[in-house]
Amino acid sequence: MSISIRKKNFCIIAHIDHGKSTLADRFIQKAKIISDRDFKSQMLDSMEIERERGITIKSQAVTITYKSNDGDFYELNFVDTPGHVDFSYEVSRAISSCEGALLLIDASQGIQAQTVSNFYMAFEHDLEIIPVINKIDLPNANVDFIKKQIKNDLGLNDELAISISAKNGIGIDDLLEAICKYVPSPKGSIKDPLRALIFDSHYDSYRGVVVHFRIFEGQIKTGDKIRLMHTNSDYLIEEIGVFKILLERKDRLEAGDVGYFIAGIKNISDVKIGDTVTLCDCPALSPLEGFKEVKPVVFSSVYPVDANQYDDLLRAMDRLKLNDASLTFEKDSSSALGHGFKCGFLGLLHLEVIQERIEREFDLNVILTSPSVRYKIIPKKGKSYFIESPEQFPGNEAIESVLEPYIRANIIVPTEFLGNIMSVCLLKRGVQTNLIYLNTKRVELIYKMPLAEILFDFYDKIKSVSRGYASFDYELLDYEYTDLVRLDILVNGDRVDALSQLVFKDSARTKAVGICKKLKDEIARQQFKIAIQGAIGSNVIARETISPVRKDVTAKCYGGDITRKRKLLEKQKEGKKRMKMVGNVEIPQSVFLSVLKSNDN
């Protein structure tokens, strides 16, 4: 028996802020799966930070029932996906569990970098792509121009494009009819051995890991004994169901269904995203094609401001890891900042989100060190290895060469700002590999550049020089040779490990001067002179001096005898010299926080 033609699985993909979550809200309201009293905007964005920033961080699946104009009932399983490049892996998972995709395009902004990236991802997975022009209610909306972009830039049939306003609910019925008509029904048979793809999971404090999965073949019911094919571990199904905002329990799920199961799994790391679920008593012969394991690309250490809160921070990291398998961390320590954790993130936005969640959800104040990437060290003797922090960087005399990760940057910008964007990319060590005129008004730039150069202000700069019109997307390439050095900051000759950085040699002096000046402004004056230095190895490349606080020791001297005054000044000078020899400069953690923040900018 083949599965019902009335099931449709699709995802909503788009560039950031093109209206994906708003469209999902309209679908939910149309299906009446939640009362008007309980409804709120960004219904599928469960985290407070998602609502505040107006972004989607975690993909969310939901099942609705829709009665089409032909009188048939359709079960629509759809996934609302993130738009930011840091979370593109979430989009790839959603695409793998669907047969169709709604490609949302802002009627006022047109096709952007992430639009193109998501389109190709859906195209490579052979999804039926329905172009949707959103925000047609805006005064500067240009639907005809967007249709030309859809036809010329993406090669899609512009006549199939559906014009909507998700905010005002215009065109939603037409879009639902198009989904029922054009999105293919799932293939597969319930008679075949069970093969289901795990595409996500989350942790429930009471029931353990809740696994999100899509069934491609076979069927599953409560009480079945399942096997995860890659980890070869067996579990007993305690509960299965579908997503209808809240979890809705079902007795059985079959091929074509998107749902969840609970099987007493206590640790989220036991569930590998992309694994295949099958039955123990009738296993499938081969697993489904899974996903590449997500690897962190940005590294930073996190420390509690109050050293007594280390155990609280450990608990917070463990809890966050339960719901975010892409977060990695291990114990770390610093002489300046105490005990903390070295963490791996998917990008700067991911880092900011984790920091905010620690501070909000667990009421902890934390300091993060300067983000860095993973470098490859080829020593003069021995095998090559990777490092993620300045402390791991060996002396230059032991290194044969250093390699750093590169990216392929894809920037779409109006032609009037082309020169500005090229100047920014040049400053960031970018090498132009292609330039494509999409039309007379818009151009696509392809650059190869180091990942480390886009960590801090690259996105802000291209937005600034293009008045907000530039869009940016990137993908990781391979490692290439670089001229890397470790920049150390010394205060009175002592290295401050929390402020050490791995930097490109040509920009080392500029960074060193900036940090030294900032420290001079932040560190309180002492009764002795304080030297602040930026150094590469034994070579000092920048210096600032904080002059000592001087007491007027000659105030009690009267008359014109200069020798008495000289004796008092010499005595003061000797005392300050002894004080400098034995005095340690206490650097408050607020100073580290200020310097690290200014360094990010």
Curated annotation (Swiss-Prot):
It is a peripheral membrane protein. It catalyses: GTP + H2O = GDP + phosphate + H(+). Signal peptide: none annotated. Keywords: Cell inner membrane, Cell membrane, GTP-binding, Hydrolase, Membrane, Nucleotide-binding, Protein biosynthesis. GO terms for biological process: positive regulation of translation. Pfam families: EFG_C, EFG_III, GTP_EFTU, GTP_EFTU_D2, LepA_C. Its EC number is 3.6.5.n1. Its main location: membrane. Belongs to the TRAFAC class translation factor GTPase superfamily. Classic translation factor GTPase family. LepA subfamily. This is Elongation factor 4. It comes from Borreliella afzelii (strain PKo) (Borrelia afzelii). The lineage of its organism: Bacteria, Pseudomonadati, Spirochaetota, Spirochaetia, Spirochaetales. The gene is lepA.
